[in-house]
Amino acid sequence: MLCDNLENWCLRMSDRMWARQRFITQGCIERGRLKASAESESKVILYRAPLGYGKSVQVAFEAGTQGREEGGVAYINTRSYPGSGEITDSLLAALILYQIKGREPWSVIQSNDDIIESLRDTLCNAKNPIKICIDGIGEAEHGVGLVENLICETPNNVKFYIAPSNAGALARLSMMAGVVTYGAHDLVFTEEEVCELPGMHSAKAKNVIEATGGWPALVGLMCHTSNPNLPAATWPETRSYFRNNLLNALPNNTREFICKAAMLEEISVACYDYVYKTEEAHKEIPFINENYALFTPTESSRECMVMHPVLREYLRGLFDSIQRERRSYVLKRVAFWHWRRGEYLHSINAAQEASDHSWARAVSDSIILDVALRQGEIEVLRTWFEKVPVRTIKKIASLSISYAWILYFSQQARQAEKILASSTESCSRGLDNLDEKGWRKLVDAVGKATQDQFAQSQTLCQQWIDTFGERNMVGKGAALTCQAYIASSDRRFEDLEQLLHRGAVANQSSNQHYAFVWLKTAELQAEIFKGDIAHAMSILLEANKTAEKMGVSKTFLNKMLGSLELQILHEKSPSLISYESAEESFNFALNYGVTDILWGCTQTFSSFLYQQGLRDRAMAILEQTRIAACERDLPRLNMLAKIQLAEFTLINDEELEPPILPDESELTFLPNQNQAIRARIALVNSMYRLRLGKQFGVAEKYAKKALQSASAISDARTKIAAQYCQALAVFGLGSSKLAKRTIIDADQLTEHLSCYFTRDWIKEALMSFSPIARDLFDTLPESAETNATKDLEVRKEEADARPKLTNTQSTITIKQISLLKCVSSGMTNKEIAERLLITEDTVKWHLKKIFSELKVTNRVRAVSEARLRGLL
């Protein structure tokens, strides 16, 4: 090609490529974590992933971060070539050279060799940073060698950003020094990135990630589909995308292979060849990985692979439509393959889909008990057991015991008791062997706790540990976990600490996954009961990390911890949760949660709905829980729902009717559970007297009673609400100064523990029905409620970062911590006194106490030491 013609060709090609670059990036978000600046020392950034992971977008964005007029960037997109695969090394070099230098070099170029040499000279002598961004290379033989040579020969200020045309292209690059590869795992969207898309928020983003697995193409489709609540594999857009962009690009035999592979629980050469009676998997699997990267190795074995769950569901549907008559046969072979290898959960999953339960008679005792009691696959086994004939279950003791366990944790206690009783019948197979390890008695003991019969469960669990604990470590972990949960529910926090330690040892030594989740639930629930939301969040994060290391199944883990996370986030700020996430957790708790779990989700969901103005829906949720409590014979749950209904009615109704509350004579639960309910009853009674606008003395009496009960069980949230009621009552009695100090005490506790919703809720409730409430709150100093109310994001970050106090013997009070916060912000003694409504002498007295406790001599060192101890 003549130089003039070559120059014109480069101009046309470059314009087309840069037009494509602008189009590709339209409506897309820049992901800073994937930008070259995140890998400043790297020479090459390589994006290697399946179709639809945003590789082209990343390369296009990198090209756009440096102005073309600077002459420091070249953007090559092979899809703009006139006939892909016909571009020689010299033409590729000409395109890069033209985009970097413009017309300047063309006057001295005489041949193709001159073009390549001129490009080499330009890059090697460049003083400023140069970017070469290439999208789609690898489709032809030409160009790859040139690019690899340029990478090796040019200085570090010349950087390359490359998206190969297929997953296996440019394999040698991956082995070079200074090459950073971003794979599918790196390129999936995070929740934070989804939030940047139009119309997204944090709660909705979580649903998007769960539905799509973060696959960027599917995220984009979900934003536009009219059926986002349906499974992603069923969206018309998804089906069209997979058909047109993936299946049509595959050879016929490969297309058939991946459809068949989707029917497997895990994809491996041996499994595929066994199920389908072939010998082709050893060729197809490497070919698919090399060219399309559709399979990902599992964590447990590099030989076993999985595909993206949405793609798998789509391909399974395709298999059903083409070979429906073979579906059951194939799944039975899959089940037998895993059964033979001892992979029983996979086997049960496959058999369940095949509706094959004939082998239930052959299942060994150890297998079913392991899957049920240790792995805790409650939902999977519940579906499976429902399809197994009851007569078969009753004839085999291990099935009866396991099914009873499943039913107890599915809140079907009456049926569980009947099934468990059937395991003692003389015709039941294998009972003697199971009783040697105490399985039946363990299920009975723990089952009592699921029905809120804690006193009986505590006794039975201790008897079980004394009798069977040394010969059944899995069972011991379950029994200790049950005792820990009982201690948490009864607010016996000192006993809980010891039981958490003993339970963790037993669970880890026996790899007890199900008990691990419940043990963490007990620990988290205790912090929520205390109202220490900041510490609860840190425990939640640590629990997820530990579960990841242990390999705990995420199915139950995510739902259980998610129900607790909902309560934590709602207490920090209702804006952090969504209707969808709250409803999902409520439905899970309704089916699988014991009293405290279900009540926590019910209270959170109903309060969220009430605050959103959906008051009828909020009260309907409480009624739904109350009905469930009556059906399941859970009087404590029924009582808690009644109290919350009374509170809502009190705030909502115009009529000044007394609230309908349980009588204290009905409190027949554990001692501290009774205290918690007494506190709530007294609180609602105080609110009612305040609503009347008179009887302030009676209102104060009830508030003090609530405060006393809440303090006895370390219930900070009820304590804060009671302090607000007490403050309004004494304000109505004429004691303005005492009222203000009481509110400041409540606000200091709120800030320290991050339980903001409780404070905001009670304040709004009091202002909604008491005319004098606004007079009280308006007379407080502007800073009295602390700066936390002004900046949610700051207080959120601080709360997340606050660790548990390492010095448990510290005598520093909440008020003194608030004073330290004032000191850390540079306030004078006078300013602190004005904020906290105390005298300057009192400030000095507190500082003296703080210095003595922290063993320091000045304010600067006091702040530093307080931070080291986790006080700030």
From Swiss-Prot:
Keywords: DNA-binding, Transcription, Transcription regulation. Gene3D superfamilies: Winged helix-like DNA-binding domain superfamily/Winged helix DNA-binding domain. PROSITE patterns: HTH_LUXR_2. Residues 829-848 bind DNA. It holds the Pfam family GerE. Residues 805-870 form the HTH luxR-type domain. One of its GO terms (molecular function) is DNA binding. GO terms for biological process: alkane catabolic process; regulation of DNA-templated transcription. Induction: Induced upon entry into stationary phase. Pathway: Hydrocarbon metabolism; alkane degradation. This protein activates the expression of AlkB1 in the presence of alkanes. This is HTH-type transcriptional regulator AlkS.
